[in-house]
């Protein structure tokens, strides 16, 4: 097999949570372009419109409506795919929410629990649901969306709940990688820097923060969703066949300083 062919995903079936927008949409596009059939999980059909539009380019993209915090729904989708004869061989746990600017002492119980439910529980529910069929097949690749915030403490904005949720995702990644390696399943994560997404740009306070972020970044720029998706594609592909338990920084050098 040529080196270029190692990046191909022909015959694979990928599931991308939150795959209809921003980073998730780019992951959907990257995997589909590499030859995978992609199932996007979004909370509504409307959220998946851009992903479905990829069909116009000849890509195999389907949508399932569901919330990653609903473990039973994730189990049902995984079972449906497996019973239909095309179980997921790739899972990208992309769905997540952000939170910044709230001091720890002002976080409500609801703020904290919501962050953990989406960013951590959702990753585990999906990994467990789709991992079962991967275990049966003795192969699979899971890529989690972590964050550099799982390693460092951001400034100037306080974001304790988000940071903790992503640190937990990183260790969940390592734990599943160690436990499932003998099943032929690789589990890795990407840890992006600040990315130009609607979630980041829409926060008015970030207009003052961005110059400070860039001053803390060796490459002096934010990332793009496409750059994150490229790393996800690599980890999902055979080109990363010896990698498991890795947390890959896609951070413009932010964590170097």
From Swiss-Prot:
Any idea which residues are catalytic in this one? 162
The annotated dependence of activity on temperature is:
Optimum temperature is 35 degrees Celsius.
Q: Which InterPro entries does the UniProt record give? A: NAD(P)-bd_dom_sf (IPR036291), Sc_DH/Rdtase_CS (IPR020904), SDR_fam (IPR002347)
Give the taxonomic lineage as stored in the record: Bacteria, Pseudomonadati, Pseudomonadota, Alphaproteobacteria, Hyphomicrobiales
Which EC class does it fall in? oxidoreductase
Q: Please provide the Gene Ontology terms (biological process) for this protein.
A: galactitol metabolic process
Please name the gene that encodes this protein. Answer: gdh
Known PANTHER family for this protein? 3-OXOACYL-[ACYL-CARRIER-PROTEIN] REDUCTASE FABG (PTHR42760:SF115), SHORT-CHAIN DEHYDROGENASES/REDUCTASES FAMILY MEMBER (PTHR42760)
What EC numbers are recorded for this enzyme? 1.1.1.16
Q: How does it assemble?
A: Homotetramer.
Residue spans crossing the bilayer: none
Q: What function does this protein fulfil?
A: Catalyzes the oxidation of galactitol to D-tagatose. Also catalyzes the oxidation of a wide range of substrates, including polyvalent aliphatic alcohols and polyols, to the corresponding ketones and ketoses. Galactitol is the preferred substrate.
Q: Which UniProt keywords apply?
A: Carbohydrate metabolism, NAD, Oxidoreductase
How does pH shape activity? Optimum pH is 9.5.
What's one GO MF term for it?
galactitol 2-dehydrogenase activity
The keyword Chaperone belongs to this UniProt entry's keyword annotation: no
Pfam families registered for this protein in UniProt: adh_short_C2
Binding residues for NAD(+): 21-23, 67-68, 94, 162, 166
Names of the cofactor(s): Mg(2+)
Q: What is this protein called?
A: Galactitol 2-dehydrogenase
Assigned protein family: Belongs to the short-chain dehydrogenases/reductases (SDR) family.
Q: Does the keyword Repressor apply?
A: no
Catalytic reactions of this protein = galactitol + NAD(+) = keto-D-tagatose + NADH + H(+)
The note describing how and how many cofactors are bound reads: Binds one Mg(2+) per dimer. Can also use other divalent cations.
């Amino acid at each position: 097999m040529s080196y270029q062919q190692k990046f191909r995903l022909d015959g694979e079936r990928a599931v991308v949570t939150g795959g209809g927008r921003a980073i998730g949409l780019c992951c959907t596009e990257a995997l589909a372009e590499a030859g995978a059939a992609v199932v996007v999980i979004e909370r509504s059909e409307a959220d998946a419109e851009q992903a479905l539009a990829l069909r116009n380019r000849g890509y195999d993209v389907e949508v399932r409506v569901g919330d990653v915090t609903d473990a039973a729904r994730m189990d049902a989708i995984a079972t449906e795919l497996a019973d239909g004869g095309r179980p997921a061989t790739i899972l990208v746990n992309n769905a997540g929410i952000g939170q910044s600017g709230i001091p720890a002492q002002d976080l409500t119980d609801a703020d904290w629990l919501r962050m953990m439910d989406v960013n951590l529980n959702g990753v585990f529910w999906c990994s467990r649901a789709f991992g079962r069929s991967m275990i049966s097949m003795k192969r699979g690749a899971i890529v989690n969306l972590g964050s550099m915030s799982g390693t460092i403490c951001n400034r100037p904005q306080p974001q304790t709940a988000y940071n903790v949720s992503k640190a937990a995702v990183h260790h969940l990644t390592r734990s599943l990688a160690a436990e499932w390696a003998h099943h032929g399943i690789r589990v890795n994560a990407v840890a992006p820097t600040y990315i130009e997404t609607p979630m980041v740009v829409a926060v008015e306070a970030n207009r003052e923060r961005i110059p400070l972020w860039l001053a803390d970044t060796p490459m002096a720029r934010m990332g793009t969703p496409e750059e994150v998706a490229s790393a996800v594609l690599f980890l999902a592909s055979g080109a990363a066949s010896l990698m498991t338990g890795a947390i890959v920084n896609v951070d413009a050098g932010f964590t170097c300083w």
